[in-house]
Structure formats: C-alpha cells, structure tokens
UniProtKB/Swiss-Prot annotation:
GO molecular function, one term: metal ion binding
Start and end residues of each stretch annotated as Disordered: 1-34
Oligomer status and interactors: Tetramer of 2 alpha and 2 beta subunits.
SMART domains to which the protein is assigned, alphabetical: Transket_pyr
Function (record text): The pyruvate dehydrogenase complex catalyzes the overall conversion of pyruvate to acetyl-CoA and CO(2). It contains multiple copies of three enzymatic components: pyruvate dehydrogenase (E1), dihydrolipoamide acetyltransferase (E2) and lipoamide dehydrogenase (E3).
Annotated residues for binding of K(+): I189, A237, I238, N242
Organism of origin: Oryza sativa subsp. japonica
Designated name of the protein: Pyruvate dehydrogenase E1 component subunit beta-4, chloroplastic
Domain of life of the organism encoding this protein: Eukaryota
Length: 400
C-alpha cells in the first residue's frame, strides 16, 4: 500500500478558493510549515502504537452508551450533528490544503443529498466543489485521475448503492494503480456516502457494500458511528496517501454529540473501546454499535459484563485491540448489519481464528443481516436486521 500510516500526507499549504492560485512553487515554499502540522498529526497517531501495532486509547474506555474521546472533555467543545461534523472536517481540510476538492451529484449549491457539503461551494467556489452529471463511473474515474495528478478529491456517492456503477473505477483504478504503476502514482482519494438499512428505502437504497469493497487490494475502509469519530476519520482519510472508503450510515446523520473545539485527527487503523467488560467481547461497527449498547443494558441487568468494541477500521482490522480483549474475555460475538455471506463478520471471524484460536473458550458467534434483498415493509425490514433481543440471546448462549 502507498503508505502504512494513514497520516503520511504530502505537505499541505495555505487556503485558496481555486486550484490555479496554488502553484508548485507556492506549495514547495510552504511545505516546511505544513509538514510540521502533518508531522504533529502523525505523531499523535504514532503515539498510540505499540511495536508498530495500533492500541486502543484508554480515554475512550468508558461505559457510556455514546462515549466521546477524553479530548472532548478537555474543552467546552460544541455540539454538532454527525453530518455537520463531516462538513467541519471538509471545511478545515479545504482551508488548509487547496488540493482538496469535492466531486459528486448535487454536492455544490444543493449541498449534497444529506447536506454534508452545504455551503462549501459558496466558500470554495465551483472548481473545488464540483457538481457532476448522474454518472458515478464518470466522476469517480475523474476523481482517480485527479488524485494521480496531485489533488486530494473527496468523491460523494448520493447513495452507496449507486457506487456499484463505479465498481470498475474503484477496483481496477482506485485500488490497483499504485501497484500496477510500480509505485509511480499515489491515489489519495476519499470515496464516501450514505448507506445501510434506513427506514423503508427499498432494496436498492439499503445496500451494505462493505463486503463488496473489502476484497479490493489497495483500499482502506472505515465506518463512522459518532460525530466525534466521523470528523476525525474524515480528516485522516483526506490526509491519507491511500484510497479510503468512508461508510456513513443513513440513520446516524442526525446523531448529536459534543466534540472538541480544537483540531483533532483519528487513526484510520484504530478500533474504539466503547465499553470495557470481562465476560464476552462484542465486536461491531456503524449503526449496530447502538443496538449492541441497548442490548448491553439488558445484559448488565442479567449479571453479564460485556466488552464492546467499535472496530471502525473495516480494512485492515485492528487486531491488537481486538486480540487484547479476546485474551481477557475468551469469548467473541460479532454483530454487523452487513450480509452474512462474505460479510465483514466472516472476514473478522477468520482473522480471529487465525490469530487467537488458543484464547477462545467458546465458538465465535456472528449475527448478521439475512441474505435477502431488504424489504420495503417496515416489519419485514426490521426482521432482516439484527435486533437487540438477538444480541442478548447470543451472549447468554456464549456465556453458558
């Protein structure tokens, strides 16, 4: 992969409203100042490594249902919705680096299908916030080409399901060009957008494409679940020299949380300890984090002490954090909204068996969505997705 660390970004220079005002000479002259900022961000990431492996921050190991990092407690901070946190990340990075740009359908003056990019066109101009035709293969390919030429594009899919139309560009170009060019090209592109099972959006708008993208060489994948990690992961993804797919769940955009006023960047390869426990390790991500925490309340009342980890990094997995938890609890439950066949849970189960088999006292259980197209009718839709009661029953079975 282009760079093992997600924060080894190119030197970043001052704000600009257009690409033309940032010449190569200007970027070189400002590189020293900008590299200090990038090095500081990379240092904060490296500080959480142990022997080159990512470790979970003790600061987030609280038993709250939606814990923010301890960083948010160090200042008064401000409350934002998740989609606003994503927007803040885009604004901050676009102000600092004139090579950051946004492509997609209605991302400009309309502000995106979920208003993540609202106001960006007025701030940065139509050259950097570019409305495109309804042609995912075209503007995704354009983003890959822009990344090859030194820009840092953020490509928005109006819905993750529509990005299947750009699968060729994401797979054969985005993921592989660094390798097939012999390292001549880096592809610092972010591909993001809403996905997951919403509320009666129908099969075509309820896609979970994690399983589609995980097998593509060269891609990193992360899934945000709170305003805090949405902003931190977005900033890290933009700075990465690797292509990053950022999954945003359609039902989480209106989550509200207080985040720090000061700048912060998260590590792309790091899981989050949501709730420490002793009896069983529950691994989850995205929307299922909240189903798991709802189930955890019931489990605590029944005398169980589950440890909940939001894996966040879907590729690669943070096996250091996951492994430390398994060595403590010796039992694992994986909860995902992805399909069971070939899903993230299947890959995670395989990785755990390969690396931590000797520490398991019970078979790994995996709760996934049913392998069916998502129904439109609400009761049927709910029946295809993992519910808190199923999580409680699974933990009781594992801990027998």
């Amino acid at each position: 992969m282009a760079a093992a660390s997600s924060l080894h970004a190119a030197p970043r220079v001052g704000s600009s409203s257009s690409f033309s005002s940032s010449s190569s000479a200007g970027r070189r002259s400002a590189s020293a100042a900008r590299s200090v900022r990038v090095a500081a961000a990379a240092g904060s990431c490296a500080a959480r490594r142990a022997g080159g492996r990512m470790v979970a921050r003790a600061a987030v190991a609280s038993k709250a249902e939606s814990p923010a990092s301890a960083a948010s407690s160090k200042s008064d901070g401000h409350e934002v919705l998740l989609f606003e946190a994503l927007r803040e990340a885009l604004i901050e990075e676009m102000k600092e680096d004139p090579t950051v740009c946004v492509f997609g359908e209605d991302v400009g003056h309309y502000g995106g299908s979920y208003k993540v990019t609202k106001g960006l066109a007025e701030m940065f101009g139509d050259l950097r916030v570019l409305d495109t035709p309804i042609a995912e293969n075209s503007f995704t390919g354009m983003g890959v080409g822009a990344a090859m030429k030194g820009l840092r594009p953020v490509v928005e899919g109006m819905n993750m399901g529509f990005l299947l139309l750009a699968y060729n560009q994401i797979s054969n170009n985005c993921g592989m060009l660094h390798y097939t060019s012999g390292g001549q090209f880096k592809i610092p592109i972010v591909i993001r957008g809403p996905g997951g099972v919403g509320r009666q959006l129908g099969a075509e708008h309820s896609q979970r494409l994690e399983s589609y993208f995980q097998s593509i060489p060269g891609l990193q994948m992360v899934a945000c679940s709170t305003p805090y990690n949405a902003k931190g992961l977005m900033k890290a993804a933009i700075r990465s020299e690797n292509p990053v797919v950022l999954f945003e769940h359609v039902l989480l955009y209106n989550l509200k949380e207080k985040i720090p006023d000061e700048e912060y960047v998260l590590c792309l390869e790091e899981a989050e300890m949501v709730r420490p426990g002793e009896h069983v390790t529950i691994l989850t991500y995205s929307r299922m984090r909240y189903h798991v925490m709802q189930a955890a309340k019931t489990l605590v009342n029944k005398g169980y002490d589950p440890e909940v980890i939001d894996i966040r990094s879907l590729k690669p997995f943070d096996l250091h954090t996951i492994g430390n938890s398994i060595k403590k609890t010796h039992r694992v439950l994986i909860v995902e909204e992805c399909m069971r066949t070939g899903g993230i849970g299947a890959s995670l189960r395989s990785a755990i068996i390969d690396n931590f088999w000797d520490y398991l006292d019970a078979p790994i259980m995996c709760l996934s969505s049913q392998d069916v197209p998502t129904p439109y009718a609400a009761p049927l839709e709910d029946a295809t997705v993992v519910q808190p009661a199923q999580i409680v029953a699974a933990v009781e079975q594992i801990c027998q």
